[in-house]
Every structure is written in C-alpha cells, then in structure tokens.
C-alpha cells in the first residue's frame, strides 16, 4: 500500500510568512511597491501584482507618496538611504534573522574584521549583507573558493552564512578556512528553520521511493532541499505548480 508523507516542516518559514502577510496587509493602499520580489515565489508575486502591488528595483522608479515594502531577503544600507532620500513610507519586511546578520557584519567590520560570507554571491540576501560591511568582504560557496581564499593574517576574520545555505556544506567550508590558521570567529547564521527542513528532508528521502519538492525555481531554500533529497532518493522531482505535478506524475516509478 502506497503512503504519502508530508514533511512536518513543509510550508513557509516564519520570516517568509511574516513578509507575505505584511504585503497583503498593505494591499488596497495607494502606490504600494515591494523592493524586489517580496519572496522567491512567482505565484505569490503574481497574485500581489494582480492586487496592485508592484515590484521595483530602484528608488528612481517611485514617487514621494509611495509605500515601499522591503523584501524578506533584505537590502543594502545604500538602498535604505536612497529610499529615505525619496521621503517614502518604508515598511521593512526583512526577515529578523537576516537583520541580525546585517547588524553582525556592520559591527564586526567596523571593528576591523574581514568579513567572509558563505553563500551565493548573486542571491539578493547575500548582496544585501555585503552592503552592510565597512571592511573587506569575501563571498564563497565552494570548496575550491575556500581553498583559494587568501586573507590578511594580521586581522581578525568573521564568518557568517546566508540563512538558507546547506548546513553540512557550511561546516565543510568553515573547516577549510580554519585550517589556514587565521584568527577566525564563526557565526552560524543559517536559520534554524532551514536546518530543520534540511534534516527532515534528508531523513524522509532516505526512506522514500519518490520525493516531490514543491517550491519556486528561484528559491534558494527549495533548491537546497531538492539537492539534498536528490542525493538520497533518485526519484526526486522539483515542482512549482500543480500543472507540473500532473506531468511529473506520469514519470513516477513506484
């Protein structure tokens, strides 16, 4: 008899749900925008667009009487400054865990530490984190980059992580850097919800014939979960919409 298991941790995390609720609460207002997609979920962004909430990528795109909601991934200090100069109403939906990283990076870099961010340099969360550093900042996401990383041995090094980075990969890259004998301070800033999801996904995949990972193609969270599940279960499928589910179902091998 076939059994369908739904992960207990499935669904939006606290930070994402908070951001989405924040935007929906602003729906119906005049000139409401999000700075970048509020979350990496195309279906949600489309629904908000239909409700009159538009996405911008620059303060130059709006007028002074606008309401701008900061995306869950956060933005750089320069973006905040540009919005304040426009005299707009700013609603900050940045995930609190991301805001914590901004504070860490700002304080550590102000004290002279070199900043190493473990994450995807092209991800908006990482771009935002970089924008709070006042010192030399480096981004790595592979063993090769960690091996080739050369830092000033006379200065402290502060290591933080993108909140959705693979936890096991984070530990691997930290170990490589620590072997270089720098004065390193490691702050595991991977969100607890990310660790819980990744751990549960791995365990469920190990005992399943088929895994279906549902989420947006641009979501770092979903991409990492897919990679983890695929390593444990060859029949792992990445689904964004119900239409894709119907197509993938024909390929399921139980």
Where are the language model's segments positioned?
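A C-terminal functional module that forms or caps the active site or interfaces directly
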Residues: 216-248
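Conserved small/polar residues in nucleotide/adenosyl-binding loops
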Residues: 250-254
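Active-site loop-to-helix "anion-binding N-cap" substructures in soluble metabolic enzymes
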Residues: 2-134, 138-150, 167, 172-178, ...
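Conserved anion/nucleotide-ligand pocket segment
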Residues: 156, 160-167
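Long, charged amphipathic helices and adjacent flexible linkers at domain junctions
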Residues: 187-193
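An anion/phosphate-binding loop that grips the pyrophosphate of nucleotide cofactors and donors
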Residues: 208
């Amino acid at each position: 008899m076939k059994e369908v298991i739904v992960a207990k941790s499935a669904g939006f995390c606290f930070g994402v749900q908070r951001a989405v609720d924040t935007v929906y609460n602003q729906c119906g207002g005049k000139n409401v925008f999000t700075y970048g997609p509020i979350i990496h979920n195309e279906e949600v962004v489309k629904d908000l667009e239909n409700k009159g909430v538009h996405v911008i990528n620059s303060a130059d795109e709006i007028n002074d009487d606008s309401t701008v909601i900061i995306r869950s991934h956060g933005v750089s200090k320069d973006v905040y400054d540009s919005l304040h100069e426009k005299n707009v109403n700013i609603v900050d939906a940045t995930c609190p865990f991301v805001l914590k990283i901004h504070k860490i990076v700002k304080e550590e870099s102000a004290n002279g530490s070199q900043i190493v961010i473990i994450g995807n340099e092209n991800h908006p969360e990482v771009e935002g984190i970089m924008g709070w550093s006042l010192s030399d900042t480096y981004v790595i996401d592979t063993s090769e980059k960690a091996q080739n990383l050369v830092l000033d041995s006379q200065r402290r090094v502060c290591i933080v992580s993108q909140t959705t980075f693979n936890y096991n990969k984070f530990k691997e890259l930290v170990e490589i850097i620590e072997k270089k004998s720098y004065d390193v301070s490691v702050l595991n800033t991977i969100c607890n919800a990310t660790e819980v999801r990744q751990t549960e996904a791995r365990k469920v995949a190990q005992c399943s014939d088929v895994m279906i990972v549902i989420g947006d193609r641009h979501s770092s969270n979903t991409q990492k979960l897919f990679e983890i599940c695929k390593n444990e279960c060859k029949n792992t499928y990445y689904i964004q919409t119900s239409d894709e589910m119907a197509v993938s179902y024909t390929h399921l091998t139980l």
